[in-house]
Amino acid sequence: MAASPAVEPVIGEPAAVADLGSERALLVADVHAGIEVGLRYERGVELDSRADERRERLCALVAETDADRLVVLGDLAHRIAAPEGDEREELVELIRAVTDRVPMTLVEGNHDAGVAEAFAADLDVIGAAGGVLGGKIGVVHGHTWPDAALLDADVVCMGHEHPQVRLEDAVGGSRVERAWLRGTIDPAAFVEESGDERNRFEPPELVVFPAFNERSGGTWVNVDGQSFLAPFLSGALPTGDAYLLDGTRLGEYRRV
């Protein structure tokens, strides 16, 4: 998979490494800690908790990539309400396990209500409009309009969308796989106020991260009738390539 000079996916994982200049960061999106609690409450679905597995995978990735920091691109938690019960317990253990090793940054997502406040002493928090790390890596969750300052970055990394592709074989069988989306941003569609003229001639690359949590579903980007969740994404990424987690380039995401 062709990588940006500053952001490189970890092959086989829904994670990437970013060069922040003074730090090497591991980036993931949509951890959705406590999802099993949420599915039980929302849909009556009973699933065994994978809290230990999620925590261990994150810590292993931090070690394997020699990261100096973990950056979560939103939706660290699952339920939209403030975390409590088993979900809060998972968050406590996950955050403690990570921050015993490296600092942790949370870019606020729509499922993170109360998380920043509850864990203010443990996390560096970037608001929902996003921010720029190391002077060149823009980060945002994607559920609301980004700050126009992200257009000054070299690369913008976002979550929220949980991109997936539906793949069919010659005999009509199909499977759904998590995917990366990468392409050049259309600046006029990326921010709510289209009058901002920054970076019109060299707009940044946009990298849409697959969900870290494989139980959280997603948007089938190559299926008619599926629409993006992010309010800006259909316009801001008019063309771009889809990649599987193993690095396979599938081509233009709408035509896979």
Q: What is the predicted role of each segment?
A:
Residues 2-26:
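N-terminal basic/disordered segments at the start of proteins
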Residues 95-100, 149-152, 201:
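Short, conserved loop/helix-junction motifs that constitute active-site signature segments
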Residues 24-32, 136-143, 156-158, 206-210:
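Active-site-proximal beta-strand elements of phosphoester/diester hydrolases
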Residues 26-31, 35-133:
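Core catalytic region of metal-dependent phosphoesterases/phosphodiesterases
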Residues 34-36, 78-80, 110-117, 145-148, ...:
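Active-site environment of divalent metal-dependent phosphoester hydrolases
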Residues 119-192:
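A contiguous pocket-lining binding segment that forms or flanks enzyme active sites
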Residues 20, 65-66, 150-152:
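Glycine-rich phosphate-binding loop signature in dinucleotide/nucleotide-binding domains
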Residues 168-256:
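Acidic, His/Gly-rich catalytic cores of divalent-metal-dependent hydrolytic chemistry
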